[in-house]
């Protein structure tokens, strides 16, 4: 397969990189992606960054026909940026989309591992920090405990087997995103990642985890906030209650209400 046809065994791949004030990072991350997997394309989805990230991305796109830019009107959140990117990818005929942070916390050099898992039969691949071979660097202990504890709670509440449902480095076949109606996802932050994994899992797709190395950003400001964690906790709790209610109704021979799965 030639570079123009995409990554071997997966087809055309688009790496979506949402940005908001990532002027210090965008050149480096796009360069690393291009070096790691030259056959993939990159979409920078910029939320009208006041630091000029969008303009830098335009310069990169002008000099590299594998880089594209989606300019959005303002800061609408991570989930909305990815949903817009997914729609762009579908319109352009891509077979696979990859989620990747702009700050370098997700190593582009590990991207072949995610794509190879798709080639080997997975429908969706979660880059995972908490399996053998995975690791986290430069996180304070309280952050690591919150992440670990949150993932344990997600497994208990939703019954998903995944060790790391909140991670943001992952790859999906476009057919999966079409089937789970990704356009109706309203979550942001970590809960957005949980919801996508939950929908894919509930719809019977083969979702696998591969180990990744997560390194906290060295440049720029983190977008993490307490509200993101609170949203995740609330939504996961509601989804878990609804899932158990639907299981009970099924056992009683009653049909769960349509449209009640996602708050």
Residue ranges of model-derived segments:
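Short beta-strand/loop segment that forms part of the nucleotide-sugar
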Residues: 30, 39-49, 70-71, 100
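Acidic helix N-cap motif at the loop->helix transition within catalytic regions
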Residues: 24-28, 51-60
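Acceptor/aglycone-binding surface of glycosyltransferases and processive sugar-polymer synthases
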Residues: 68-91, 96, 108-190, 217-232
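Cell-envelope/extracellular polymer assembly enzymes that use nucleotide-activated donors
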Residues: 12-14, 41, 195
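A conserved acidic beta->alpha catalytic loop
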Residues: 46-56, 74, 104
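N-proximal low-complexity "stem/linker" segments adjacent to membrane-targeting elements
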Residues: 1-32
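Hydrophobic helical membrane-anchoring modules
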Residues: 1-10, 159-160, 182-263
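Residue-level signature of catalytic and energy-coupling elements of molecular machines
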Residues: 26, 33, 85, 103, ...
């Amino acid at each position: 397969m030639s570079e123009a046809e995409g990554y071997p065994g997966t087809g055309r791949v688009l790496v979506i990189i949402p940005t908001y004030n990532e002027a210090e990072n965008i050149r480096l991350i796009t360069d690393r992606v291009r070096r790691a997997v030259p056959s993939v394309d990159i979409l920078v989805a910029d939320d009208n960054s006041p630091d000029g990230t969008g303009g830098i991305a335009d310069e990169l796109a002008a000099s590299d026909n594998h880089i594209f830019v989606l300019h959005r009107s303002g800061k609408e959140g991570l989930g909305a940026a990815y949903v817009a990117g997914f729609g762009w990818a579908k319109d352009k005929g891509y077979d696979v989309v990859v989620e990747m942070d702009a700050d370098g916390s997700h190593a582009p050099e590990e991207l072949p591992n995610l794509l190879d898992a798709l080639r080997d039969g997975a429908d969706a691949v979660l880059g995972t920090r908490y399996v053998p071979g995975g690791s986290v660097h430069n996180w304070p202990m309280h952050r690591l405990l919150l992440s670990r504890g949150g993932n344990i709670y997600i497994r208990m509440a939703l019954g998903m087997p995944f060790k790391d449902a909140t991670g943001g480095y992952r790859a999906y076949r476009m057919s999966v995103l079409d089937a789970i109606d990704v356009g109706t996802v309203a979550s942001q932050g970590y809960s957005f990642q949980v919801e996508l994994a939950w929908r894919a899992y509930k719809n019977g797709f083969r979702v696998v985890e591969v180990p990744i190395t997560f390194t906290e950003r060295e440049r720029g400001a983190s977008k993490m906030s307490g509200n993101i964690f609170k949203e995740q906790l609330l939504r996961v709790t509601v989804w878990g209650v609804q899932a158990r209610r639907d299981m009970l109704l099924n056992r009683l021979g009653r049909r769960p209400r349509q449209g009640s799965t996602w708050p």
